[in-house]
Amino acid sequence: MTLIRVGILGLARRVGTFAEVGLRSWEEAGCAAVEQALMESADDLYVVHRPVVIRSDRAELERILRDWCDTPNIAHRCDLILTVGGTSFSPSDAVPEATRAVLERDAPGIASVLRHLGGPEAAFSRGVSGMRGKALLINLPGHATGFANQELLIQAMDALTPYLPEMVSGLNKDPVPPWGAAPPPR
C-alpha cells in the first residue's frame, strides 16, 4: 500500500498564549495525540505533515483545507485531513461549516462513530466528515465537545485507524461506470 499523507489541523480560540509560558495548548496536545495514534497503528503507512494549530477562523480554515486537498504539489497534498477542536456550540467554532463548504461528498458514518465513542457529552459535537477530490476530511471533537481528556481522543483514533487505509484507498480507485454504460477505453 502507498503512503497516506496526513494533515493534522488544530483549531483554537487563542493561539500562542500557552507557548509563552512554556506549555502546550489542549489543541497542540490533541494534535500530538492524533499523530501518535496514527504512528502507533502503522508508522510505515502514514506521513504526517507537521501538525498546525491555527486560530478558529472559518475563512482561513477553508483556505487551508482547499490547499491541502487541491494543491498540485503532490508533496504538500493530503490524502487524509484530521481537524482537532472547533466543533462545539460556541459562535467562534465554525469548523463543521468550513469543512462542509469544501466537501464534495459526505461520510456521516465516521462522525456518528466519533459521537458514539464520546458518550453523552459528545452531543455537543457538530463535527462532520467527507471527501474532497481524493482526500478524506474528518472533524475530531475538542475537549469541550465530548473528548474531555486525551484518552477519549486516543480511543476514537484507535477505533478509526484500522479503517482509514481502506477508506483512503477507496478514494483513489477508478470510478465504476453506471449500469448499462460502456466501460472506459483502456
Where are the regions a protein language model picked out?
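Non-catalytic beta/alpha edge segments that cap or flank active sites
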Residues: 1-186
